[in-house]
Regions:
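Active-site microenvironments that recognize anionic phosphate/pyrophosphate groups
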Residues: 5-34
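Short, basic/aromatic beta-hairpin or loop at an interaction surface
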Residues: 42-57
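Short alpha-helix capping/helix-loop boundary micro-motifs
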Residues: 59-66
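Short, small-residue-biased leader/transition segments that mark boundaries at the very start
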Residues: 1-3
Length: 119
């Protein structure tokens, strides 16, 4: 069973678009998830622009991968390091703590996540 930052059952992040390292709608993780895709974030135009600038274009559709592209308001499981970087750049999106995995805390302090809590 997964658990969230709050020590409760990990809630689903999004199924439309389908997110998560395992594409199961959940920001859970495992040994094969080197990027730690554990932060359930609500996309903003500012974050999407920063991510594209940093080389990870999440907004452009990639039909060959079945990826429609993200838009503001979509929920997506972000890499913990990218979230922390966005925080440092002043462009971090809001997060759903109940859908964010506890492994995130190995990279991002809870106090920082709480600054962006949407739930």
């Amino acid at each position: 069973m997964c658990s969230s930052d709050l020590g409760t059952k990990l809630e689903q992040c999004s199924t439309a678009p389908l997110t998560g390292f395992f594409r199961n709608g959940c920001c859970d993780t495992g040994p094969q998830d080197q990027g730690l895709h554990t932060v359930c974030a609500l996309m903003t135009a500012e974050f999407l622009a920063l991510s594209k600038y940093l080389g990870n274009d999440l907004s452009t559709p990639r039909p060959e991968y079945g990826f429609a592209g993200l838009k503001p308001g979509d929920k997506w499981c972000l890499c913990a390091t990218r979230f922390l970087q966005a925080h440092e750049e002043g462009a971090a999106p809001n997060v759903r703590l109940n859908a964010t995995h506890t492994k995130t805390l190995s990279v991002v302090p809870l106090e920082i996540l709480q600054l962006y809590a949407a739930d």
